[in-house]
Amino acid sequence: MGMTMTQKILAAHAGLESVKAGQLIEVNLDLVLGNDITTPVAINEFKKFGVDKVFNKSQIAIVPDHFTPNKDIKAAEQVKYVREFSNKMGIENFFEVGEMGIEHCLLPEKGLVVAGDVVIGADSHTCTYGALGAFSTGIGSTDMAAGMATGQTWFKVPSAIKFILKNKPAKWVSGKDIILHIIGMIGVDGALYKSMEFVGDGLNYLSMDDRFTMANMAIEAGGKNGIFPVDDKTVEYLKEHTKKEWEVYKADEDAEYDEVIEIELNTLRPTVSFPHLPDNTRTIDNVGDIDIDQVVIGSCTNGRISDLRIARDILKGKKVKKGIRCIVIPGTQNIYLQALEEGIIKDLIEAGVVVSTPTCGPCLGGHMGILAKGERCVSTTNRNFVGRMGHVESEVYLASPAVAAASALTGKITDPELV
């Protein structure tokens, strides 16, 4: 029996001719990632190993992003601790505030991840890089520490679900709507410890930003990773952003999948995830009359330039409804700069939007837009658990940038076709 795309990458990095689902293997790592929340714990564990250097100074990336710029004294102390460790170890990819960005937007932009890589990150949405044809997955701080010390980690080889995406999606149906539809269909544990492998002619209509969004939310279906085949769009992106060499892995024709699911993209509608789980989805036609207090457009899921362009296209020349707070957060400094150069920021501010520096911020209830008791938010983020963005009695509705921007104009969850 052949191997899936994920299994081929893992086999190569384990120095094995083949692997099979359930097999325990030790693999060599191309990149180890941490942020301002998880890295301090990893450093504490690293110090217990009795080693005085990291395995490779250029293959570790540390991105303060959750509470950046420092939101309080504790956040400042955390980043200081991480900064001092990075300087002592000579870690080349520590991203200071001037280079700031949400880690999963920043690393592809910096060319640190390429097709065929194995990447671990002490952040659950590390699965984002599957959009580039890499195997990437979230791990805990202890595994991050071991990875920094040895350049290796262990995995149980995952089985896979193949998603065959067919046809062209409608105008307002984006990668966010597709992945919300999938999560709603299979559930938050529907791909538990499985590789979600996306194929089909529908990929021709999905931009790299769409793919980043979809791979990013694989974890919300329980997936070990989400991954896309390398095609012309992938290669174009890699050529633009990196000087590293990459390797393309393809699933075998006789690869075994636990399930094969076909999705007709042309039948999908904009989709909203209701509180308090990402799989509690409804199409925009079935959301009902729901008043909101806040809109957030950003995050590692939807903070890229195409997301900001969509928001601008809907909001330009109009006004955010009085009493509604609309917060836009570019994913990186470069995205922010590009949005400035394209006039997007000007158009958004004139529409009544507040624009933040790049940060995870409100997504995890950190800062820059926390919800009070009883408040509702339409957000382009990736999780809507109880208390995720603030008070435990607040509500988060996950949606695309188009739905979020349209909702900011009306004060209700709104179909972008109607504005």
UniProtKB/Swiss-Prot annotation:
UniProt: [4Fe-4S] cluster binding residues: 300, 360, 363
The UniProt record lists the keyword Amino-acid biosynthesis: yes
Pathway the protein contributes to: Amino-acid biosynthesis; L-leucine biosynthesis; L-leucine from 3-methyl-2-oxobutanoate: step 2/4
Gene Ontology molecular functions: 3-isopropylmalate dehydratase activity; 4 iron, 4 sulfur cluster binding; metal ion binding
InterPro entries: Acnase/IPM_dHydase_lsu_aba_1/3 (IPR015931), Acoase/IPM_deHydtase_lsu_aba (IPR001030), Aconitase_4Fe-4S_BS (IPR018136), Aconitase_4Fe-4S_dom (IPR036008), HAcnase/IPMdehydase_lsu_prok (IPR011826), Homoacnase/IPMdehydase_lsu (IPR006251), IPM_dehydratase_rel_enz (IPR050067), IPMI_cat (IPR033941)
Cofactor binding remark: Binds 1 [4Fe-4S] cluster per subunit.
One Pfam family matching this protein: Aconitase
GO biological process, one term: L-leucine biosynthetic process
Catalytic activity line of the entry: (2R,3S)-3-isopropylmalate = (2S)-2-isopropylmalate
NCBIfam families, A to Z: hacA_fam (TIGR01343), IPMI_arch (TIGR02086), LEU2 (TIGR02083), PRK00402.1 (NF001614)
Subunit structure: Heterodimer of LeuC and LeuD.
Family: Belongs to the aconitase/IPM isomerase family. LeuC type 2 subfamily.
Function: Catalyzes the isomerization between 2-isopropylmalate and 3-isopropylmalate, via the formation of 2-isopropylmaleate.
HAMAP family listed in its UniProt record: LeuC_type2
Protein name, as recorded: 3-isopropylmalate dehydratase large subunit
Species the sequence originates in: Clostridium botulinum (strain Eklund 17B / Type B)
Gene: leuC
